[in-house]
């Protein structure tokens, strides 16, 4: 499925084109036949371009499959100048991502859950706040390097550039979940053609995700 969106003045995305074609070259979210996948992508893109009345040159693509993994991590740094800056946030995120992952996996997302300043919990926007110690709790999502490369290769063979690779259920959450739902607690379940993707949100952030290689 290919979807074309137009960004409105108020920051909302309006869908102006949709294209679809059976995904013959994918099995349970993973490319198993490059030629068939390329053909399916081309057909879906052509339909979306025709409906939207524009040419597509780059895309954001979703990723799923049983190869996707996730874990919670955290990092701690000293706050420079006693006031949190964007540099401090970057450093603490880097500290949180410094965990060992299998050699065949790559990091897809580092999703902040909350920040703590001098043990004060529940902070989501720490920049400008005072303190001496900054801690970040994050949810890290990884996927097989080869699976991601094959998706990118198929898209590039269609003459398109890949702007970003996004976890399927994370992309779904942007379109169907409200801020209040994520804050109070919600589980999104996306039953697709090859996988069933789920994600649990609480406190405004993702807490857990899973991919089940069984679908509709």
Residue ranges and their predicted role:
Residues 200-202, 210-211:
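Active-site proximal loops enriched in glycine and acidic residues that flank catalytic Cys/His/Asp
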Residues 3-189, 205-209, 216:
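Nucleotide/phosphate-binding catalytic cleft detector across ATP-hydrolyzing
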């Amino acid at each position: 499925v290919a979807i074309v969106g137009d960004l409105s003045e108020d920051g909302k995305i309006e869908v102006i084109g949709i294209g679809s074609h059976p995904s013959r070259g994918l099995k349970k979210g993973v490319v198993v036949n490059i030629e068939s996948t390329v053909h399916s992508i081309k057909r879906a893109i052509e339909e979306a371009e025709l409906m939207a009345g524009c040419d597509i040159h780059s895309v954001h693509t979703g990723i799923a499959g049983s190869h996707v993994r996730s874990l919670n991590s955290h990092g701690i740094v000293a706050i420079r100048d006693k006031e949190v800056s964007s540099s401090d946030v970057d450093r603490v995120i880097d500290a949180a991502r410094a965990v060992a992952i299998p050699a065949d996996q790559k990091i897809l997302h580092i999703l902040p859950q909350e920040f703590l300043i001098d043990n004060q919990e529940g902070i989501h926007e720490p920049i400008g706040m005072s303190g001496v110690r900054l801690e970040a709790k994050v949810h890290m999502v990884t996927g097989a390097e080869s699976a991601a490369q094959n998706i990118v290769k198929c898209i590039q063979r269609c003459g398109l550039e890949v702007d970003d690779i996004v976890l399927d259920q994370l992309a779904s959450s942007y379109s169907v979940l409200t801020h209040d739902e994520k804050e109070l607690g919600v589980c999104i379940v996306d039953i697709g053609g090859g996988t069933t993707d789920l994600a649990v949100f609480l406190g405004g952030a993702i807490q857990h995700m899973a991919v089940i290689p069984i679908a509709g």
